[in-house]
Design a protein with these regions (language model features):
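Sec-dependent N-terminal signal peptides
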Residues: 4-13
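Amphipathic/hydrophobic helical signal segments and adjacent flexible N-terminal regions
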Residues: 16-86, 90-92, 128-131, 142-147, ...
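Surface-exposed beta-strand edges and their flanking turn/coil or helix-capping segments
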Residues: 58, 111-114, 124, 137-138, ...
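Predominantly extracellular/secreted and cell-surface proteins with exposed
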Residues: 87-132
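Short, surface-exposed coil-to-beta transition loops
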Residues: 108-111, 140-146
Length: 188
């Protein structure tokens, strides 16, 4: 029984969100406390480059609203621009990012995420975890989180992590994890 509890504890603790920096490191501008305001600005909501976990680049993009939410209520055709405003919070390296989504300069949606500045990127507080059945016995869990930063050309970079894990009685293990990113051109 003690061994079983230790095994379950190891699985739960070991299944944290894990971003891969190698896919974005060649075009990443490191954001620090001194240049954190550079993230503020207007960007096109349609990405210009999609990067998968194997560092393959393509023009097939998800769109800004889909990248920040696993279950986006905002369709990519409903918006054409994103404005980001930054507000420092009391905690060290903690910020609130406000996203103003517009279509033809008409405001459509506003939402906010708290973020922590880690390793030159903003780790957003949009972490979601949904479990079905009895996780790792007869079910699984899905986890999602985003982080964002800037490219060397001052464009917006959003990176997502998605994990789907589970199994049947610890015998038949099933699951996968995906890292992917998209870049969005700065307007101003």
């Amino acid at each position: 029984m003690k061994t079983f509890l230790i095994l379950v504890l190891c699985l739960v603790m070991g299944s944290c969100v894990s971003f891969s920096k190698r896919m974005i490191k060649e075009d990443l501008m490191v954001v620090t406390k001194d240049n954190v305001n550079l993230i503020e600005g207007k960007y096109y909501s349609a990405g210009y480059e999609h990067i998968d976990s194997n560092r393959n680049k393509s023009e097939k993009v998800e769109g800004f609203s889909k990248m920040l939410s696993q279950k986006s209520i905002v369709g990519s055709e409903e918006i054409d621009k994103v404005e980001i405003k930054l507000k420092p919070l009391a905690k060290n390296k903690s910020y609130q990012l406000e996203f103003r989504l517009t279509k033809n300069d008409s405001l459509k949606y506003v939402f906010r995420h708290n973020a922590k500045l880690k390793k030159g990127l903003f780790l957003l507080g949009n972490y979601t975890s949904e479990c079905h059945g009895i996780p790792y016995l007869l079910g699984g869990c899905q986890k999602f989180q985003s982080r964002m930063g800037l490219t060397k050309d001052n464009h917006l970079l959003v990176q997502d992590y998605y994990e789907n894990s589970g199994g049947a009685l610890f015998i038949m293990w099933a699951g996968y994890s995906i890292n992917y990113g998209e870049k969005y051109k700065r307007i101003q």
